[in-house]
Amino acid sequence: MQTISPAFSCDLKSVIQPNLTAKKARYSHVNGKRVSVRCSYRSESFSFPNGVGSSRADWQSSCAILASKVVSAENSSSVAVVNGHSNGSVDLSLVPSKSQHNGKPGLIQPLTITDLSPAPSHGSTLRVAYQGVPGAYSEAAAGKAYPNSEAIPCDQFDVAFQAVELWIADRAVLPVENSLGGSIHRNYDLLLRHRLHIVGEVQIPVHHCLLALPGVRTDCITRVISHPQALAQTEGSLNKLTPKAAIEAFHDTAAAAEYIAANNLHDTAAVASARAAELYGLQILADGIQDDAGNVTRFLMLARDPIIPRTDRPFKTSIVFAAQEHKGTSVLFKVLSAFAFRNISLTKIESRPHQNCPVRVVGDENVGTSKHFEYTFYVDFEASMAEARAQNALAEVQEYTSFLRVLGSYPMDMTPWSTLPSEDV
């Protein structure tokens, strides 16, 4: 199996010296060889409660939002060293700045160069990367998965993966599916591309609120912004609360709340969490506006090293494989039967286009040439890799696959959840 390992690197220079001429992250192409993502923003000076910076740039530095940069493969002469291991494809230009607001530390302490170190020893704070800004549901998931940890917000999903790989973070907590919106395909693709291991899962009830600046009434709202999934999950409530308001998609729920506060928008509301309202000084116009009370998002906990599977509690195992068509017909049926014959329950199966060979051309002298889409399959099943039945099932599955990889064997999240809002969501 050939591992997909593009030359990625993280760069925080755009956070240290932000370009305040753009409104959102933009992509710059340099001679067709390099793509960089700059987090930049236009706004006047402002201040949030709880000591969140005095400008967008200060806030970014305080939160240490990682900016990603794809480095040209031709730049193979520069060799970076991480914990004694050299890697010619990684550029460690990671020098985050320290920022304070009126002499006081910001909401989240910025990264320092000492963060490029091994996993914390006894007594050290665990560093957990998540995608989004403070107040996002991913932050709540990170807090539930690893209480008393140091949360590291990242601007993109793949940056969170890189943060763990480069020892900037010790864990990553990322969403993979929602009970209403379905799978988050981007993260499934990243699980295959990166070599991190699933070490746990956590489920978070999604409790949406309608937020606006203090003093703004619902009938004054002409625009509602939020993440597309949040807007879809609150469509019925928004039609009743703000029937004349325009609905606009935003890249993140908490970032939508931050945007309203930063630009002092009295005609705009955001769909976000109650914590986002607290962080950015907004009022809650309506609480619990999700159309379905059973709205839950499942997050995976990722680490550089796998955990040791056990049998003293319910475990779940996640795998990814590609079927071998030359093994005959009904290959997928044979693969899934390996679990059924051993009384192993499947909790999820997801297909994604094969990254190396998305289309297979088949020629037949009788019917002509046909094209078939090639897929990789992600499967979750309820068994621990410490069990003989799971090992035997995968041994049989391997007979019908061109590649098979165990993404992780980890404890199931068995904690009951409530549709009522929690303190951290």
Swiss-Prot record:
Q: Which InterPro entries match?
A: ACT-like_dom_sf, ACT_dom, Preph_deHydtase, Preph_deHydtase_CS
The superkingdom of the source organism is Eukaryota
- Record CDD domains: ACT_CM-PDT, PBP2_Ct-PDT_like
Keyword Amino-acid biosynthesis attached: yes
> For this UniProt entry, what's an example GO CC term?
chloroplast stroma
As annotated in Swiss-Prot or TrEMBL, what is the tissue specificity of this protein? Answer: Expressed in roots, leaves, stems, flowers and siliques. More abundant in stems and roots.
Keywords, A to Z?
Answer: Amino-acid biosynthesis, Aromatic amino acid biosynthesis, Chloroplast, Lyase, Phenylalanine biosynthesis, Plastid, Transit peptide
E.C. no = 4.2.1.91
Reaction(s) catalysed (UniProt annotation): L-arogenate + H(+) = L-phenylalanine + CO2 + H2O
Q: Name one GO biological process term.
A: L-phenylalanine biosynthetic process
- Which compartment or compartments is the protein found in? Plastid, Chloroplast stroma
Task: Report the induction information.
Answer: Strongly up-regulated during stem elongation.
Q: Where is the transit peptide?
A: 1-38
Pathway participation: Amino-acid biosynthesis; L-phenylalanine biosynthesis; L-phenylalanine from L-arogenate: step 1/1
Q: Which residue ranges does the record assign to the ACT domain?
A: 320-411
Residue ranges annotated for the Prephenate dehydratase domain, each copy included = 127-304
Any single GO molecular-function term of the entry would be: arogenate dehydratase activity
SUPFAM superfamilies found in the cross-reference section: ACT-like (SSF55021), Periplasmic binding protein-like II (SSF53850)
> What else does the entry mention about this protein?
Has no detectable prehenate dehydratase activity.
What role does this protein play?
A: Converts the prephenate produced from the shikimate-chorismate pathway into phenylalanine.
Q: What is this protein called?
A: Arogenate dehydratase 5, chloroplastic
What organism, scientifically named, is this protein from? Arabidopsis thaliana (Mouse-ear cress)
User: Which gene specifies this protein's sequence?
Assistant: ADT5
